[in-house]
Amino acid sequence: MTALTLDDMIQLQHLATVGKLVNGLIHNLSGPLQNIGMDVELLEMTLPNEQRGREELVEGIIQRLKRIGEEVDQMAHFIKNTSMRTGTRDETQDLLGVNHLLEQELVFLESNLYFKHQVQTDLKTKGELPRVCDLPRGAAQALGWFIQAIAEAMEMAGTKRLSLEVKMLPPTLHIIFSSDGSPFASSFTAQLNLDRDIADILAADGLNAGEKVTLAALKTCGGSLLFEEAPSGSRTTLTLPIVTP
């Protein structure tokens, strides 16, 4: 049997992520769809027997229709963002600034599109940041996976808040993940090191398959990781090269 190459593993990880998004999308759509159905049924039952004055009746209908419109807008937003991830390379996304990419990832997390969790996030950016296309090929995808991995590890540790700080230190981009409270599992933090061969990363104990592929993908992009832990929390710095001449 032919062994999977790293490119094969990255493609499988991408498909798994799309699967997570579709599953999360279905979960997030069920609530708005149910609300719309209830509002429509309520209107159907109320209108034939409505005894209120015309103005009051019209106002009530308008408010229900506004709520239906908000639910539809929310569904359209989820569908649009999910569809952007169905391809491995999106030229439109390449033109996004890194800050917009990170904002989108955090929206996905907060909407429980990847998985259900209690982790709260905030993002701070300093100065002008590069576009996605200014990073090595595949870096944006690997960055999204790494954010998921950090959030999942925090959820398991019971940590409630994740702060991201992004800044340029040419010729590199620094993304700093800070968390308060409970420490990560040592089996996870011990592997936050890219100063080794890809084969060693893929063979490491203490990580699941997705985490291994994520770290290997970051390694191929020229990324580096520094993990620091203190009594008040932890700090992980991901450094990525900027490839624009």
State where each predicted segment sits:
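Conserved signal-transmission helix
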Residues: 1-17, 187-190
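Short beta-strand/loop element within the Bergerat-fold HATPase_c
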Residues: 159-179
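Glycine-rich/acidic phosphate-handling loop/turn and adjacent ATP-lid/helix
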Residues: 172-210
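Detector for a conserved hydrophobic position within an alpha-helical segment of the HATPase_c
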Residues: 214-219
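Conserved catalytic submotifs in the C-terminal HATPase_c
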Residues: 118-130, 169
